[in-house]
Amino acid sequence: MPASISRSTYASMFGPTTGDRLRLGDTELVIEVERDLTTYGEEVKFGGGKVIRDGMGQSQRTRAEGAMDTVITNALIVDWTGIYKADVGLRDGRIAKIGKAGNPDTQPGVDIVIGPGTEIIAGEGRILTAGGMDAHIHFICPQQIEDSLHSGITTMLGGGTGPAHGTLATTCTPGPWHIGRMLQAADAFPINLAFAGKGNASLPAGLEEQVRAGASCLKLHEDWGTTPAAIDCCLSVADRMDVQVMIHTDTLNESGFVENTLAAIGGRTIHAFHTEGAGGGHAPDIIKVVGAANVIPSSTNPTMPYTANTVEEHLDMLMVCHHLDRSIPEDVAFAESRIRKETIAAEDILHDMGAFSVISSDSQAMGRVGEVITRTWQTAHKMKVQRGRLAEETGANDNQRVRRYIAKYTINPAIAHGLSRHIGSVEEGKRADLVLWQPAFFGAKPDLVLLGGMIVCAQMGDPNGSIPAQPYYSRPMFGAFGGALHASAVTFVSQAAAEDGVGERLRLQKGTLAVEGTRDIGKADMKLNVHRPSIEVNPETYEVRADGELLTCQPLAELPLAQRYFLY
């Protein structure tokens, strides 16, 4: 006989279902479950007296007969593709199927087979997201990787060689020798990594050798001279070799203004870093490029969101990051030209409109590597509080806003850098780089992080406890050690390097995957973040207008996902 139970009872047993709503952390963001791919009355759940037992929810099928390696049961997926409930089957380190798990011999509608060789991760009452991607990394110290991973980032892309002064200021791993050493160093870390070569040159040979050596992209930075000639040369190499170009434009406008830079780019695809300008770029109007079809605009997180402390802290950061001297007036003027509260305020609103497409960190070089995800959701919260619900929302929820913001650190950087066939979303066929969250801790502290289908870090209690008891904090797990590390994580390289056998040549232990499809894309390919307003910046007051509308908002004095989550 069918039985009926209350929604609250059902949610406590199997997690929320279609029509249920829940709050993300302590923010004002509320999501609603759009659909449920599991079957009422046939849900699978692990535990004493539960469903996943021999002959019940667990079949006799072997791995060779299609049983999964791992099943995440009853998870609430939050992704750019939607907000929905499902079981997720993992095989060979990838997402094999999203649907209904169980035993096809005893249950109807099963498309994810649980067998004797299947591990279970309980997703009931938890949120499942794709692992984040941080596409603006200065590899200044290896300890960044731990902080990033434990925040929910599973892919880091950038450049550097350690605390050399070139790396402290620019995201470049210059030259084949340094690229080779960094690719070898990547073998030590349980995270996907990709390295950017230096893109500043007026002749192509020095750039081509870096791409062949394994650089997955090239970085143009003003500290190396981002002249029109360097821009044109770098993009020409990128077009021939299918790698992305990132640009930090000329703050001092020495070699031209923003219009000259756009002319040098010539309609070719480019990823514009810290497009608001506090992190660097044509002062005061680099923000104009958000309206260009070929430019993928991104933010770095120190200006996200605009708060009471944002402007004050930036001057000191600039002096350190760009090797400036407070005793030199020109250095101070350089720093002050970049910090404009008007453009910082406009940046929040442009993100909410979907005009900025990506959020990243700028790690230790005016950015906080462990706060990409937290600051994304703080910004979404701030905009909900200050601007209200988005016009495109339907129902009493913030689903559209949540999908827009999660795309900024998952699918959009993956598309921008040619990695979206492998990472960036919770979709079948992609790598099982996944993050599980308790809703109350969403955006602050992940519960589990999986890389290539294996748990690499998790909230864990006292190892000497009879059960995992307090204190709980994020610790590395078995996927972060030994040969499992090399099987779980990958290093992304250029197609030219992959074809040249860079893995064998350098005796890399991690697998390598080639980037692809970076040149025939643009703003229109950025999921849920495609808006292209016409931007005007007043050169005297720095006021920003989008399609004639003044963009301004107040700084917040208090944020969610902050001190109450990080007492120790």
Curated annotation (Swiss-Prot):
Similarity field: Belongs to the metallo-dependent hydrolases superfamily. Urease alpha subunit family.
Entry's Gene Ontology molecular function annotations: nickel cation binding; urease activity
A cellular component annotation (GO) from this entry: cytoplasm
Protein name (database record): Urease subunit alpha
Keywords per UniProt: Cytoplasm, Hydrolase, Metal-binding, Nickel
Residue positions binding Ni(2+) 2: K219, H248, H274
Cofactor section: Ni cation
Organism this protein belongs to: Cereibacter sphaeroides (strain KD131 / KCTC 12085) (Rhodobacter sphaeroides)
Residue numbers carrying N6-carboxylysine: K219
